[in-house]
Each structure stands twice: as C-alpha cells, then as structure tokens.
Amino acid sequence: MIGNWNYGTGRRKSAVARVFIKSGKGDIIVNGKAINEYFARETSLMIVRQPLELTNHAATFDIKVNVVGGGETGQAGAVRHGITRALIDYDATLKPALSKAGLVTRDAREVERKKVGLRKARRAKQFSKR
C-alpha cells in the first residue's frame, strides 16, 4: 500500500481504524467489504461519510480501512477519525474546516470500570430499609 496513499489512524472507545486514501471514484472498503455491507445502521454510514461530505470529497477518494475492536458505533467513530486524519495528511488546508466541525479531536470517552461492592460502575445495590 505504499505509493500515493495517504494514511490516518482513528480511535474511538476500544476500536482502532487504520485508514488509507488515494484518488479514485469514491469506493470505501472496510475489512474487505463494501461500506454498505459492513455497517448495517444508516447512522453509522452517516458518521463515516461526515468528513468527506464536509470537505466535498465524497466521490474523490478510494478508501481502504482496517478496523478492529469495539462495536459498530465505536468502529464507525474510529473510521471517521481515521478518514479525517488521512484527509489532513492529504491536504493540510482542510484542517480548519474539520476542526471547526469537531472531527479532528479524538472522543476520549471510555467505559468506566466496575467498582468493587457496586453492581455497575456507579450503580449501588438496592437499599432495603427493613
């Protein structure tokens, strides 16, 4: 994949996406499948296409993505972050527009760990007065 490919790494929750973009006709391949086959939800497809539509490059690039970890929403967010970074690698003048839309910043929210003595991260056992 060396040559005229631009690269970006995206992360969201526990998902990590490695994104490669090059000039093409708009094909997006995720883990060897077309994007419509890989992501079942329409919202996930919208999330992934956000940086491309914002910069008017929806049909300009062929994109290959390798994504591991997490669930569908986390993977979609990781792919979006990776595409954003790859676009900045391709053309640094796109960064202000992408930053203004909040796509450059990594969403740092992670699942909070379960605490000892509680049922979940913050949910305590039911209190019985008698």
UniProtKB/Swiss-Prot annotation:
One CC-aspect GO term: cytosolic small ribosomal subunit
Q: One Pfam match, by short name? A: Ribosomal_S9
Keywords carried by this UniProt record: Ribonucleoprotein, Ribosomal protein
Q: Which GO terms describe its biological process?
A: translation
Record GO terms (molecular function)? RNA binding; structural constituent of ribosome
Taxonomy, superkingdom: Bacteria
Keyword Oxidoreductase in record: no
Q: Which family does it belong to?
A: Belongs to the universal ribosomal protein uS9 family.
Q: What is this protein called?
A: Small ribosomal subunit protein uS9
Q: Which organism is it from?
A: Ralstonia pickettii (strain 12J)
